[in-house]
Amino acid sequence: MAKAKFERNKPHVNVGTIGHVDHGKTTLTAAISHVLAKTYGGEAKDFSQIDNAPEERERGITINTSHIEYDTPTRHYAHVDCPGHADYVKNMITGAAQMDGAILVVASTDGPMPQTREHILLSRQVGVPFIIVFMNKCDMVDDAELLELVEMEVRELLSEYDFPGDDLPVIQGSALKALEGEPEWEAKIIELAEALDSYIPEPERDIDKPFLMPIEDVFSISGRGTVVTGRVERGIVRVGDEVEIVGIRATTKTTCTGVEMFRKLLDEGRAGENCGILLRGTKRDDVERGQVLSKPGSINPHTTFESEVYVLSKEEGGRHTPFFKGYRPQFYFRTTDVTGTIELPEGVEMVMPGDNIKMKVTLICPIAMDEGLRFAIREGGRTVGAGVVAKIFA
């Protein structure tokens, strides 16, 4: 069969493997790569290439991650796999590899284990929207009833964390046997790929979302008015659009009267572009770095939220000592630091460097935020933690 030529016009979807240590995440990643390359064309990556994950730095945090790509007839996938549990925690909290969906790998010889639960909880906290289950090592279990029990257990665990445990796809397979080329197990990998295609919806592109631009700088241009600059995070702003200035102070409305990029006047600014936006009737002192410019009504300012936080270890340049309740660091959102206080979960007295923890944060002034927004925790300009907004209270 002729190999289909790779085209960039297919929808791009980000996925990853999650699950307990030694349940076969990396073997499955290699099996998907091999079976799909063999079936639909593309380059296969083997286990050792994936397992030997390169180090990356995201917000000063060292993370080992492997990125591979593969294709199905209708989509292009970018897939992330991490060697160690700590790498998953860091990856999910910093958003270094944001996932449109995850493949939860559970060894049917073991059933759900502690990290299975922790990865499901993390997925819920950081906003991974869809999970598909791959029950691995099914070639080692002869008892069909046992497989059924494990499947029920996994589904119940997912339901416990508000995923649709009863309805999501569960595929029973063997990554190793598929990698070794046994047809009945290769077919299970194709079944998994088909589940990815049908169960994970096509992600909305940044450009189709409501306009938002974090304000980095403010200038006043004589005879023209006030210009704010920044990189458009999502959406499109057009000349004549009404926009809101949100965060830190009371929300105000104004109109975009011009868009500039590299000293050229444009009709619009789009997601990913650095531009200057001229605001009608806005004074230089009405707006500051740390606020955002957004489509009216699309985002609100908040001060209190629950977050999932990773605290940098000493080796990563973080704190050398634990912190306790009453800790008041700065929380860095998009372009600015805001002081806040923390509340630790019941029964937790202190947090050690290298831990990940759920904490409630109250900021001294409101910031434009949605669930899923990433932030850094800093002390005097030094990053000591990374977090994600899990749930907004006020």
UniProtKB/Swiss-Prot annotation:
Region (G3): 81-84
EC numbers for this chain: 3.6.5.3
Alphabetically ordered keywords of this record: Cytoplasm, Elongation factor, GTP-binding, Hydrolase, Magnesium, Metal-binding, Nucleotide-binding, Protein biosynthesis
PROSITE patterns xref list: G_TR_1, G_TR_2
Molecular function GO labels: GTP binding; GTPase activity; guanosine tetraphosphate binding; translation elongation factor activity
Subcellular location(s) per record: Cytoplasm
Keyword flag Chaperone: no
Protein name: Elongation factor Tu 1
Annotated spans, G2: 60-64
Domain tr-type G positions: 10-204
Assembly: Monomer.
GO cellular component terms attached to this protein's record: cytosol
Species this chain originates from: Shewanella sp. (strain MR-4)
Function comment: GTP hydrolase that promotes the GTP-dependent binding of aminoacyl-tRNA to the A-site of ribosomes during protein biosynthesis.
Residue ranges, annotated region (G5): 174-176
Entry similarity comment: Belongs to the TRAFAC class translation factor GTPase superfamily. Classic translation factor GTPase family. EF-Tu/EF-1A subfamily.
Region spans: G4: 136-139
HAMAP family: EF_Tu_B
Positions annotated to bind Mg(2+): 26
Binding site for GTP: 19-26, 81-85, 136-139
Catalytic activity annotation: GTP + H2O = GDP + phosphate + H(+)
Cross-referenced NCBIfam families: EF-Tu (TIGR00485), PRK00049.1 (NF000766), PRK12735.1 (NF009372), PRK12736.1 (NF009373), small_GTP (TIGR00231)
